[in-house]
């Protein structure tokens, strides 16, 4: 997959879908279930681009039902209906984990793959 670089800055996350539409950034499906014990598979796709100072990701999710229990950042959002983004952008072994539930509560952590520390937002 080739990730497109966009010029300029995004001032508000709500601008991302329109910006991606205008730049013809396409959706990519996520159609793999990694855990046998959790066979449920919602319909998920994403599109991604970057700027000089940001990685921009837009998810589209269709589920049978949703859960949104956690409203405080760095809470247990992974137990809610959520999406995740993992990256090692500098190739230095520092692994970033970003999780967001369906009410925009964020969990952000960084570190080695087995030793993540929360980043206060």
Regions found by a protein language model. Name each.
Residues 1-24:
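Polar/acidic, low-complexity leader/linker segments enriched in S/T/G and N/D
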């Amino acid at each position: 997959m080739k990730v497109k670089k966009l010029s300029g800055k995004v001032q508000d996350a709500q601008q991302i879908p329109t910006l991606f539409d205008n730049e013809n950034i396409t959706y990519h499906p996520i159609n793999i279930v990694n855990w046998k014990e959790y066979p449920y598979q919602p319909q998920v796709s994403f599109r991604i681009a970057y700027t000089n100072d940001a990685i921009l990701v837009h998810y589209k999710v269709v589920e049978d039902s949703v859960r949104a229990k956690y409203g405080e950042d760095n809470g247990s959002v992974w137990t809610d209906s959520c999406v995740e983004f993992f990256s090692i952008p500098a190739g230095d072994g520092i692994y970033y984990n970003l999780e967001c539930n369906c009410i925009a509560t964020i969990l952000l952590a960084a570190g080695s793959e087995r030793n993540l520390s929360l980043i206060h937002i």
